[in-house]
A protein has these predicted regions:
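Conserved catalytic core of the tyrosine transesterase superfamily
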Residues: 1-232
């Protein structure tokens, strides 16, 4: 990229001086930033008719950046994630320009005001009631192993707890002797929350707790509520 225009000059300074020496950015990250600018330069040449040797900071505007971003999704069929990554690079460059090209502060701030695109195509996946029922019917509730699996599935569905939170449960985490039936969950940052349990889940847990396998292993209420397949 030639350095005979103010745009090329500042791009070179940004990539070769600011990012590696002031921000201590890795070489791989710098390469990804460079690729984003290469795409922008190619867009300006192909769609705006401005060759790289003629491209100036005055052409680096909010309107042109928006056209570039739309070009990525509409014509290049890039994902929303890729579009937002390119926007993040451009915003970072614009932030830096606020300090080295102060005279165009408003121009850079307009670019920085461009919002990231929400991925409207991303849908939340969830189980239907029929799916949950089918899932809970899979373990063989007549065996200790099946009772364990059923208790795990039912608890995770009922409480929405994370896998690690499930692994951290101890025998005394559950209160099944009197109402209200509850379970104490320790989450991130050792934050504790008390979650109520429906009677249907309580019945499943009671059967599991009474199983021969669990009684033999859980002599202490501080022992794990669920052992792994190796009995640990």
């Amino acid at each position: 990229m030639r350095t005979d225009t103010d745009f090329a000059k500042q791009i070179s300074r940004y990539l070769s001086e600011y990012l590696p020496h002031e921000r201590n950015v890795s070489s791989n990250t710098i390469l990804s930033y460079r690729d984003a600018f290469v795409q922008y330069v190619e867009f300006m040449r192909e769609k705006k008719g401005i060759k790289v040797e003629k491209l100036r900071l005055e052409n680096f505007t909010k309107d042109n950046v928006l056209c570039f971003l739309n070009h990525l999704t509409d014509e290049k069929h890039c994902s929303v994630k890729t579009r937002n990554q390119r926007l993040a690079v451009i915003k970072s460059f614009s932030t830096w320009l606020q300090y080295v090209e102060v005279g165009r502060m408003e121009q850079w701030q307009k670019i920085r005001s461009i919002p990231a695109m929400r991925d409207m195509e991303r849908k939340l996946n969830y189980l239907t009631l029929e799916g949950v029922k089918l899932l809970l019917e899979q373990p063989d509730a007549n065996t200790p192993k099946g009772q364990r699996h059923l208790a795990i599935l039912a608890l995770m569905y009922e409480t929405g707890m994370r896998v690690q939170e499930l692994a951290d449960l101890t025998v005394d985490s559950v209160r099944l002797d009197v109402e209200p039936y509850t379970i104490r969950i320790v989450g991130k940052g050792r934050k504790t929350r008390i979650v109520p349990l429906f009677k249907s889940i309580v019945d499943i847990l009671r059967i599991y707790l009474k199983s021969e396998q669990h009684v033999l292993k859980s002599a202490s209420i501080q022992h794990p509520l669920f052992y792994n397949t190796r009995g640990e």
